[in-house]
């Protein structure tokens, strides 16, 4: 008899964003005339940069000619894209990262889950609370946890609270942890990390033989020159960190799909016999076996991000969304609400008014304002009483949503 992976049965209810979609769909069906503004899931709204579109159109035409047609590409990504990423995103910031340490993929969400394939089942794992749900759920699916308690916390995971009291940056744990998930600029709180903060984590990881999974999906939104964009700006990070990045939010690739994972050649972890094993070799083997690479057409679009025209167009996209974040932050702050994030990040983290729970505020916002956000409790127990609003929408929708919220929830 066939059996299932019973770890899936441990997962709490539905994944956060499908549950949001279910509630919104039910409301929309009952209220077909409602003009719903979605500031929930972090999906972009503005068109792809012209440079990327033109590059992909050219690539499509190449696929129509036998002499320039491309079939299977390298599982790791084409060298011309990896080289541009290495030069522009890392070496330009003083990071010692080479092209062959960069693996192109179809999304950071996939990579942050798939990376667990190359690690053992007996690692201790730390996540912040609140946290991007994928980090937790993929560990549950892989059998790295026990059951969840009433607060949604899984046995076997080490939760590091991030709160207003610690500026939404986790404290270094007292105990030894093997795998550590960090995300800066942070999803969902919009918090950022200083070089000093990341240096403390790198020092901890090196002292304890830990590996940091560093999610830098929102690094393009950093405007403060003093803040690091990459964990590899910190001395010693090549010996303890894997970094994930994406073209989704800076270049609008949410529907086009292109991302990257950096695994330094110098990064190792222990085998069962105590010997050091190069993680680059394991990840390369994993990708070569389970992944056929990103479309040639999409990679040409991603390459165009690094052209002078592409750089200018991406910068304008990022500025547009950051201005949306500023509008959300300033409008809600002026109305008397407690607001965090929205600076150097596209997410605004709002304290729910009137003592409402996160999901109660979600429902009230949907039903009274026809605005969709994301309940903070969906990101973890420490997110209860908070709410995430995304800057990824049109200017008109953001401004209209703020007017609706302020009129119904004045401080």
UniProtKB/Swiss-Prot annotation:
HAMAP family: DapL_aminotrans_1
Binding-site residues, pyridoxal 5'-phosphate: 72, 108-109, 132, 187, 218, 246-248, 257, 292
Protein name as it appears in the record: LL-diaminopimelate aminotransferase
Superkingdom to which the source organism belongs: Bacteria
Biological role: Involved in the synthesis of meso-diaminopimelate (m-DAP or DL-DAP), required for both lysine and peptidoglycan biosynthesis. Catalyzes the direct conversion of tetrahydrodipicolinate to LL-diaminopimelate.
Family, similarity comment: Belongs to the class-I pyridoxal-phosphate-dependent aminotransferase family. LL-diaminopimelate aminotransferase subfamily.
Pfam families per the UniProt record, alphabetical: Aminotran_1_2 (PF00155)
């Amino acid at each position: 008899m066939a059996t299932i992976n019973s770890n899936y049965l441990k997962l709490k209810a539905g994944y956060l964003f499908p549950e949001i979609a279910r509630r919104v769909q039910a409301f929309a069906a009952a209220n077909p005339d409602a003009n719903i503004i979605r500031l929930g899931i972090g999906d972009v709204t503005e068109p792809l940069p012209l440079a990327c579109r033109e590059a992909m159109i050219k690539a499509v035409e190449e696929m129509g000619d036998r002499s320039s047609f491309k079939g299977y590409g390298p599982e790791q990504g084409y060298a011309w894209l990896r080289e541009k990423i290495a030069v522009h995103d890392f070496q330009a910031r003083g990071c010692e990262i080479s092209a062959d340490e960069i693996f192109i993929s179809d999304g950071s969400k996939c990579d942050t889950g798939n990376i667990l394939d190359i690690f053992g089942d007996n690692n201790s794992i730390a996540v912040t609370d609140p946290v991007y749900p994928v980090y937790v759920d993929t560990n549950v699916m892989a059998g790295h946890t026990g059951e969840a308690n009433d607060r949604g916390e899984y046995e076997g995971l080490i939760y590091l609270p991030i709160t207003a009291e610690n500026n939404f940056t986790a404290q270094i744990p007292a105990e030894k942890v093997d795998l550590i998930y960090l995300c800066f600029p942070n999803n969902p709180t919009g918090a950022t990390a200083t070089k000093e903060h990341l240096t403390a984590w790198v020092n901890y990881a090196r002292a304890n033989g830990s590996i940091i999974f560093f999610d830098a999906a929102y690094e393009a939104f950093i405007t403060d020159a003093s803040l690091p964009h990459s964990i590899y700006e910190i001395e010693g990070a090549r010996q303890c960190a894997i970094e994930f990045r994406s073209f989704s939010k800076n270049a609008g690739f949410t529907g086009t799909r292109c991302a990257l994972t950096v695994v330094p050649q110098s990064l190792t972890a222990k085998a069962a016999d105590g010997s050091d094993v190069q993680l680059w070799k394991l990840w390369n083997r994993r990708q070569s076996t389970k992944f056929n690479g990103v479309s040639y057409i999409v990679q040409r679009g991603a390459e165009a991000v690094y052209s002078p025209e592409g750089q200018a167009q991406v910068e304008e996209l990022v500025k547009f969304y950051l201005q949306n974040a500023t509008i959300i932050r300033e409008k809600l702050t002026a109305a008397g609400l407690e607001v965090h994030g929205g600076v150097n990040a596209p997410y605004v983290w709002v304290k729910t008014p009137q003592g409402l729970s996160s999901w109660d505020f979600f429902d009230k916002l949907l039903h009274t304002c026809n605005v969709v956000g994301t309940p903070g409790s969906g990101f973890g127990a420490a997110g209860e009483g908070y709410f995430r609003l995304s800057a990824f929408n049109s200017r008109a929708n953001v401004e209209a949503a703020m007017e609706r919220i302020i009129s119904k929830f004045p401080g």
